């Protein structure tokens, strides 16, 4: 049964008071510094019912932040930049400006609608989630390999997308120009929604490392092959004409072979046999594909076929502005009731969107969690403050979050 948003006014106060992980949250946004020197210059925005925005909120410490959060109970919480003055006093300063902010990325499933056949718009199913699995794996690899960013957190938005927060100091100190340069370099969708897998002059066939690495990550664990069958990409013969740089000779070869290789599984093996040099090494003459040798840009067909479908489709504007607001981890999506939970990249394929912690289910756990604590005979446990977010459905996601926080301040 889907979430009834009428419940939000009764669920939010219980959730914020008992389950929002305020201690690790404020520890993260302090980055090891004293409250009065840093945390108090961070902007928070509370979004209330009817999309009422309260911006430029700032707080001296964890206690003040939690008091405001648990008394206001916003439907959504956004995190902004660190400014040179306290945001709450922004109108007092003519030089008020953002000076620091995590590097962030936003990937939305609706941007995959041109290649997503199982669902459309805001609907998400397990087949859809594979798009996010590969997008996260590819971009996470690139952020470490290309830029040596270590503190990376991936958060399910609560409905149909994921957000990435990069907390390394060198990432937080980037200016807008540098952020734009990174986002532009990582974005392969430059014109007309087409993924560019080569660079240089029109007739050149140079494949940059970013493309080759993304391709290798995409094919590593077999997720992409499952997507081929889930989405029906090889059921029809559209795949023959989709690559605009393919020569007529190359198209004729594909068309001819597709009459022999008719099932999606056969066609996938055929395509790899024609365009994947490593895969070709495993073929024998009897397979009939070694007689075909693609030339020029035809050789890049498989790169395009794969990355057009699974390369991260970034909302570049989210990444370029230091002062951009982004939805906080552990806030609630008001329409689905889902908690925006940090993900474990190593286990991202196991994440089931339909089983994401939902606010009504989370708050309903409280009585049983308190009862379990009451039955605990360990006196030390009883004397410690009970942190409900350390127990129940949210616990593994809080653990993911705390690992990110540790990476940020180490």
Curated annotation (Swiss-Prot):
Single annotated GO MF: DNA-directed RNA polymerase activity
InterPro entries: DNA_primase_S, DNA_primase_ssu_euk/arc
Record EC number: 2.7.7.-
Signal sequence, renumbered to the chain: none
Gene3D superfamilies: DNA primase, PRIM domain
Domain of life where this protein originates: Eukaryota
One Pfam family recorded for the sequence: DNA_primase_S
Broad enzyme group: transferase
GO cellular component, one term: alpha DNA polymerase:primase complex
Record's keyword terms, sorted: DNA replication, DNA-directed RNA polymerase, Metal-binding, Nucleotidyltransferase, Primosome, Transcription, Transferase, Zinc
Active-site annotation: 43, 106, 108
GO BP: DNA replication, synthesis of primer
Motif Zinc knuckle motif per record, residues: 118-129
Family indicated by similarity: Belongs to the eukaryotic-type primase small subunit family.
Assembly behavior: Heterodimer of a small subunit and a large subunit.
Miscellaneous: The bound zinc ion is not a cofactor. It is bound to a zinc knuckle motif that may be involved in sequence recognition and the binding of ssDNA.
Function per UniProt: DNA primase is the polymerase that synthesizes small RNA primers for the Okazaki fragments made during discontinuous DNA replication.
Protein name per Swiss-Prot or TrEMBL: DNA primase small subunit
Gene from which the chain derives: pri-1
């Amino acid at each position: 049964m889907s979430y009834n948003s009428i419940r939000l006014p009764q669920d939010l106060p219980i959730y914020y008071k008992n389950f929002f992980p305020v201690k690790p949250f404020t520890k993260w946004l302090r980055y090891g510094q004293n409250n009065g020197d840093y945390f108090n210059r961070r902007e928070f925005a509370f979004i209330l019912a009817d999309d009422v925005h309260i911006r430029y909120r700032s707080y001296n410490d964890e206690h003040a932040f939690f008091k405001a959060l648990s008394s206001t109970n916003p439907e959504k919480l956004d995190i902004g930049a660190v400014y040179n003055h306290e945001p709450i006093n922004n109108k007092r300063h003519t030089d008020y400006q953002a000076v620091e902010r995590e590097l962030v990325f936003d990937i939305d499933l609706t941007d995959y609608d041109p290649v997503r056949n199982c669902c459309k718009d805001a609907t998400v199913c397990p087949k859809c989630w594979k798009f996010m699995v590969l997008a996260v794996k590819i971009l996470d690899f690139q952020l470490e390999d290309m830029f040596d960013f270590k503190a990376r957190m991936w958060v399910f938005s609560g409905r149909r997308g994921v957000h990435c927060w990069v907390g390394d100091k060198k990432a937080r100190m980037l200016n807008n120009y540098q952020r734009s340069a990174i986002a532009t370099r990582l974005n392969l969708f430059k014109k007309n929604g087409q993924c560019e897998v080569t660079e240089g002059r029109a007739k050149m066939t140079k494949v940059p490392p970013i493309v080759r690495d993304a391709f290798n990550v995409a094919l590593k664990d077999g997720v992409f092959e499952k997507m081929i069958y889930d989405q029906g990409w090889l059921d029809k013969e559209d795949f023959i004409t989709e690559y605009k740089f393919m020569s007529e000779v190359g198209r004729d070869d594909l068309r001819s072979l597709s009459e022999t290789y008719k099932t999606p599984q056969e066609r996938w093996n055929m395509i790899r046999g024609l365009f994947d040099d490593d895969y070709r090494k495993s073929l024998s003459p009897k397979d009939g594909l070694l007689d075909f040798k693609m030339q020029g840009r035809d050789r890049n067909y498989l790169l395009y076929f794969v990355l057009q479908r699974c390369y991260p489709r970034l909302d570049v504007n989210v990444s370029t502005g230091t002062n951009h607001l982004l939805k906080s981890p552990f806030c609630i999506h008001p329409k689905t009731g889902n908690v925006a939970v940090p993900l474990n990249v190593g286990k991202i394929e196991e994440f089931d969107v339909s089983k994401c912690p939902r606010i009504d289910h989370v708050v309903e756990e409280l009585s049983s969690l308190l009862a379990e604590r009451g039955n605990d005979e360990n006196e030390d446990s009883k004397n410690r403050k009970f942190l409900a977010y350390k127990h129940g459905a949210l616990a593994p996601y809080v653990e993911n979050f705390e690992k990110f926080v540790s990476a940020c301040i180490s």
